[in-house]
Amino acid sequence: MAAADRKITYTAAEVAELIRPLTQSVEALQKENAELKRKLEHMNEILANAQRARFGQSSEKRSYVLSEDQMSLFNEAEICQDSKAEEPTEETLTVKAHARKKKRTIDELAKNLPVEEIVIDLPESRLTCDKCGGTFKLIGKKLVRRELIIIPQSEKILEYYSCTYACDKCEKDTGFAHIITTRTPPPLMKHSLASPSTVADVMTKKYVDGVPLARQEKIWARQGVELSRATMANWVIRCAQSWLKPLYKHMKRQLLEQSVIHADETVVQVLKEDNKPAASESRMWLYASGEYSERHIRIFEYQPDRSGKRPESFLKGFSGCLITDGYAGYNQVQKVTHCGCWAHARRKWREAMPDGATVKTSKAAVGFRYCTKLFSLEKKYIYADVKARKEYRQNVVLPLLEEYFAWLKSIHPEKGSKLEDAVRYSLNQKQQLMAFLDYGDVPISNNLAENAIRPFVVGRKNWLFCDSVKGAESSAIVYSLVETAKANGIEPYGYLLLVLSMLPYLGKSPTHEELEKLMPWHPAVRHREHMRK
């Protein structure tokens, strides 16, 4: 038999041995391909989130998941166009879920402004009728238009003189005159031009309007006043430390007596701080009373770092519910009920959505809808009393959350993905996220704290940094007062003017009762003219 006709036979074991390298190679390639796909998806998530952060809308109130029958944004005009459609009137114009508000009238815009009438009357020379020689008589006047005018800020120097009197009779009878001298009002700062109105104006512009002192210096110069930024900084720090600090401490004591406190923090840079380089990051912490609290309080506190011992120290003596974003540092706070933030949980799902997601069944979309449903349920009982809200949560909200966490356990996301972040956040925070169900006065999110700290974040973009620790501490004091005033519906400048005018009369150690009468929620403050926003 020729060699070519011979058959080569292999046993099963030999065949397995021959293909083993090929099988191993295929398996290795499959694993490598899966890993590359996972990395690609992860990079696409990062890119999509970066584009969303830069170009997308920031609001979380609307759903980002479109059903198949929803129209494209860019085709909406062509799809809906109808030449026979009636124009909506101001009274009937409606949008999804609510009726559009009517435009504000001129009366509403100008209701808090003084009004001066400009009557264009006939001069005496024209009161004689050119047709019959009779005399014109006024039979009425008509409003033709209104104008909003600006009266530029004016400045002046007030010079206080005390008067001295001597008794003539005492001098004649005894040879010594009885002398009395009038007392001038106590100054805000000795040997300084600073007045309550000027310091209140500087503080309001910086801490409410976000105008840095360097820019204020230029504004003053245009008005003919040479007021340096260094002088203004000195005024702010001295007034905050000498006069406003007792109010700040009183507000803090009131805050620690509340049943619910929100907490958040953000970065601040302090140039001149011991044992720290100028470029290092410090922290501004924010503590606020709950949404359903009777007293709306916002307290800012400067600290050199983000250590958990900072909130632990600040909240010493507090034993209520603490609402945070899940930062582990807050776990050092003992004897409190830690409550989570569902807005953060929902945000995680939003970040996990694939770019341009339109499929209702995507896991991120499902998680997002669970959270959105929770917010919708809560909104229905926003005006209910505490007891009714607690019962509603136990009967209606609890089943939804039990379903949500059961669904979470069925998800097995890729490691390192945004989807894994969303799942892990909710599972790790389950106890904190469920805590609000046992209370009727605990909000479901930490949005209140985020909104309260936002003015500081916006202002920081303008003034960038604090020069010294004293400056940072003083900024915390002023921010606390103006944000607490705003939270209580009080106009910030009017409030600062009031307290800076009154505190010098109370001295360096005002009593609890005296400080309480200067709180933004006190009737004595709320009923003052021009104090309401």
Regions found by a protein language model. Give the residues of each.
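Short, flexible loop/hinge motifs at secondary-structure junctions
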Residues: 1-193, 262-263, 290, 324, ...
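Catalytic center-proximal scaffold of phosphoryl-transfer enzymes
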Residues: 2-6, 126-128, 137, 162-166, ...
